[in-house]
Amino acid sequence: MANYTAFRVTPRGRLIPIPDSTVSVPTGSDPTQVLISPDQRLLFSTEQTSGVLRSFKILPEGRLLQSPNSPLPLPESEFPPGSPPPAHEPLGLQIHPSQPILYVNFVTINRLGVYSYERATGKLTFLKTVPNSGQIPCWIITNRAGTRLYTANTGDNSVTVYDLADPTTPVEIQRVTLNSNGSASATQLTLDPIESFLQVVNRRNSPNVTEGNGLHVLNVKRDGTLSEVSSSPLALPSVDDSFPQGIVAVDSKA
C-alpha cells in the first residue's frame, strides 16, 4: 500500500523506521516526491495519479502530522472544463529558500503552480499558475539566493529559467533546448555547490536502449541564464539494464 514513512539515519547510514510514523494513502495515489522545508519542520509531497498535494508537520520524534487542509487537490479552475482528476498531475516540488512559498509543476497543462504555506502547520494556499513554454515540466530547482528557478521539461528535452524578483509571480526569461544525443528526456537537475553549472540527467524510458542516456552540463551566467558547454552531454552507460534517474552535486572537499 502506498504510504509515507519516516526513518532515522544512523552514523553508518542505516535506515531505521520510526515507530508509528507511517501514513497510508489510497492505493494508486502514486506518491512521487517528498520535500522538507528549509527549517526541517514541514514535509510536502506530490501524488501524481490522485492529483493532490500533501503537507505534514514533522513532530519532534519524527512522526508525521498531516496539515489541516491536506490532501489538497489541484485547483479545477486551472484545467480544461470536464477534465478528470487523473489529468491533474502534480510532479516536481521546490520551496523558495527564504519565503514560505511552494512551487509545483502542473505537468499536463505546462504551467508552474505557486502556493503559500503556513510555517507553523504547513497548510497550503493556492495563489496562481504561470506559463511554461517547455513541454511536460517535471523537476524544479532554485538557486540559493531565490532569484532564479529552473524546470526540467521532459516533453521537449529543455530547461526553462524563471526570474523570481516577485517570488509569487515567476516570470520566464529563457528556455534552452538541450543538445541532442538520441531520443531522450530531461529529468532531474541540480546546481553545483558554487552555482556555476547546472547539470541535467537525460534518460530513455527503456532500460534496453542506452542511446540518449547522458548528463548535460550548462554554464550559469551572471544573470542566471544558461548555455550548454561544448563537451555536453556526457554519455552514461547502462548497468544491469538500468537507466539514470536522479542527481545531486556535492563539494568533494566538504
Task: Annotate each predicted stretch with a short phrase.
Residues L15-S24, L64-E76, L124-P131, V171-L178, ...:
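Beta-propeller fold detector
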